[in-house]
Amino acid sequence: ISNDLHENALKAATAKGSETTPYNLSNNTGGNTVENTANCYVVNAPGYYSLPLVYGNAIKNSATNASAYTSTVTGTNILNPFINHAGNGITDPYIANNNGCTPAKAELVWQDAMNLVTDIKYNADSNGGNISFKVDRSSIRQGNAVIAIKDVSDAILWSWHVWVTDEDINDVIEITNHQNVKYN
């Protein structure tokens, strides 16, 4: 047993998802609907997880959030639309629905704790599918990993940061600034 309070809290947490039904990190309850996507997902328990193949936060409240990959600002130094790995403009939140983007496999790019994230898989399905992975109870600890979706030529189409921590990111903490203004 570890003397690390954070590691012990993670190991004691109730596991989420299963190998056949991973916990969807883009859904507040782990359900199938893609609600809110991100470039970084927080994991706070062992289990099986999945994330949709979406560019960053391009889905918000279950709808397309085009402001995540386009801009209403004009000028010579404005990238509009944002471009993908191949230099093509991003036209759709779902990676597979963009020109030259055909997901083929998911891989670990790096992790800062051994065996933090394992069993990484690309699962083909509607809208390009998803990536699933496991965070094992025996090796869970605070740490970070980057997982990528690649095409058949090993080009990275997009990547996501996975942060494993026992911190409750939904816990609202009131902060008071120097001017005595309170923020939640």
Predicted features by range, described:
Residues 141-152:
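A short beta-strand micro-motif common to beta-rich folds, especially ectodomain repeats
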Residues 44, 52-54, 134-136, 150, ...:
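A structural detector for beta-sheet-dominated domains
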Residues 153-160:
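Short, exposed coil/turn segments at beta-strand boundaries within extracellular/luminal domains
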Residues 126-142:
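Extracellular/luminal low-complexity segments enriched in Ser/Thr/Pro
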Residues 161-171:
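Short beta-strand edge segments in extracellular beta-sheet folds
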Residues 108-113, 118-124, 131-132:
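Ligand-binding face of N-terminal immunoglobulin V-set domains in extracellular IgSF glycoproteins
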Residues 145, 160, 183:
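Residue-level detector of short, conserved catalytic/binding motifs and their immediate flanks
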